């Protein structure tokens, strides 16, 4: 995995990494997704293969 992008389909704070992971895979065709805190906000980030 070498490409991290904020989710294009997630709205609001990310508090459930498992849901973020599933949504990234199902809706954005990513390999993985996870919640991370950036700039004092929890966001869903999707990870894609190179």
UniProtKB/Swiss-Prot annotation:
Keywords: Antimicrobial, Disulfide bond, Fungicide, Plant defense, Secreted. Pfam families: Gamma-thionin. GO terms for biological process: defense response to fungus; killing of cells of another organism. It is found in: Secreted. Disulfide bonds join 2-50, 14-35, 20-44, 24-46. InterPro entries: Scorpion_toxin-like (IPR003614), Scorpion_toxin-like_sf (IPR036574). The keyword Iron does not apply. One of its GO terms (cellular component) is extracellular region. It comes from the Eukaryota. Belongs to the DEFL family. Possesses antimicrobial activity sensitive to inorganic cations. Binds specifically to the fungal plasma membrane. Has no inhibitory effect on insect gut alpha-amylase. This is Defensin-like protein 1. It comes from Aesculus hippocastanum.
């Amino acid at each position: 995995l070498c490409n991290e992008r904020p989710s294009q389909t997630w709205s609001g704070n990310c508090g459930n990494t498992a849901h973020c992971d599933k949504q990234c895979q199902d809706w954005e065709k990513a390999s993985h997704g996870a919640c991370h805190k950036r700039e004092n906000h929890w966001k869903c980030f999707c990870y894609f293969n190179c």
